[in-house]
Amino acid sequence: MTTFRELGLSDSLLQSVESMGFEEATPIQAETIPHALQGKDIIGQAQTGTGKTAAFGLPLLDKVDTHKESVQGIVIAPTRELAIQVGEELYKIGKHKRVRILPIYGGQDINRQIRALKKHPHIIVGTPGRILDHINRKTLRLQNVETVVLDEADEMLNMGFIEDIEAILTDVPETHQTLLFSATMPDPIRRIAERFMTEPQHIKVKAKEVTMPNIQQFYLEVQEKKKFDVLTRLLDIQSPELAIVFGRTKRRVDELSEALNLRGYAAEGIHGDLTQAKRMSVLRKFKEGSIEVLVATDVAARGLDISGVTHVYNFDIPQDPESYVHRIGRTGRAGKKGIAMLFVTPRESGQLKNIERTTKRKMDRMDAPTLDEALEGQQRLIAEKLQSTIENENLAYYKRIAEEMLEENDSVTVVAAALKMMTKEPDTTPIALTSEPPVVSRGGGSKKRGGNGGGYRDGNRNRSRDGRGGDGRNRDRNRDGRNRDGNRDRNREGSRDGNRGRRGEGQGRPGSSNGRGERKHHSRKPQA
């Protein structure tokens, strides 16, 4: 393992890193930082949870001259949440060097951002639309920028930000250094690299290095109409301290959060149609524990860093395997254990295989719990808590009443009454969620799998390949935000000012695409 002291970082940054409790660099950090400190362009392929923020953040901060009152580096991120998270991380790392960091993103008052820009920040972290907005207003000048970071470049492609990114890169000095990080390298991202980067060092963290040993992963085969009852039974059995439930569309998130509240769970949802103030309010309540279940879309959850998340429930299977890795990365952090559950409908077995190939890890099968099993599971959890109380607490104050009860009742009856009082009675309030179309992918079919419970998948052959219809046109209907040419649709989450009408994340008429029709997987051809 490589220590941070071996990487050639300045003393002030080492002081910050050590105060944060880090000594050894992760593989992506150990390979990236030395090249970046030499000024080389970098293409880093890494998933969430690998430490890539510090991989680009440390060399970025190391180059900053705090005596200069100008913007010297920009970090471009796909979502507001990720921009905020990266900004907070860079602030912690650059604290002892006194580097001024400013996050800018849609949904925040632009006049407030203009006032903050006049205070001469050294590094800007922002979403493409809002950065470009400030460039066009001439409230952000990039003539002194030395380093540009593209974080989660493939996600920015998916959201249609390619034109904005090209416009920003055209506005910075030709001599700047570019650090591009992306889980995958589709052709439009490769063209960006060819056009704007000079002999980049390609650093790739293999999938086996990004799977998360602290996370137990299970899948459940369940019909679409039964998913909600299965979810509530799992919540009753597992009693998570903090849980995130992922839905594929905004409509799904709204309906799920409302349905969970009807069944007695403290739940709220976040997605791109919420104002920034509302999203921050929901996240604050979740961190404080006043909300026990957070329901989120993939885009809204990007960059979330919430400690203490014990369970992740993939209510809808994600559209792509990379999103699955991002989702489950919300748990199992800082050495703690986490549990991830994936709901798979009969026609989605091919997508499950795609996820397993990407993570290089076979998931264990779990049978969907029955109502009786949910009640018994609750009782066993309560029994464990009672046993822990017996072993660890002083019960002297309670024994007199207990002895009086035992004079009139046998001990089994007393314990049974205690279990009944502490067990949540099942709520069978009727819930009708709008069905979402399955994510059908190549690789399905009838195969027997091992794991906990075994069982067969649907033996019917999948009617489409790679999500395409019989005419070969792509029908992945719920991916976030790409229009036909891979460029940004302005009526979508993450628009320039965050206030325009937004669609996307599968919102639209039931059974339709995300409002923009079928997508082609290409972007505008870069200019020579």
From Swiss-Prot:
The keyword ATP-binding applies. Residues 214-374 form the Helicase C-terminal domain. A motif (Q motif) lies at residues 2-30. Residues 428-528 are annotated as: Disordered. The keyword Cytoplasm applies. Keywords: ATP-binding, Cytoplasm, Helicase, Hydrolase, Nucleotide-binding, RNA-binding, Stress response. GO terms for molecular function: ATP binding; ATP hydrolysis activity; RNA binding; RNA helicase activity; RNA strand annealing activity. It is an enzyme of class 3 (hydrolase). ATP binds at A46, Q47, T48, G49, T50, G51, K52, T53. It is found in: Cytoplasm. One of its GO terms (biological process) is response to cold. GO terms for cellular component: bacterial nucleoid; cytosol; ribosome. CDD domains: DEADc, SF2_C_DEAD. Oligomerizes, may be a member of the RNA degradosome. DEAD-box RNA helicase possibly involved in RNA degradation. Unwinds dsRNA in both 5'- and 3'-directions, has RNA-dependent ATPase activity. This is DEAD-box ATP-dependent RNA helicase CshA. It comes from Bacillus anthracis. The lineage of its organism: Bacteria, Bacillati, Bacillota, Bacilli, Bacillales.
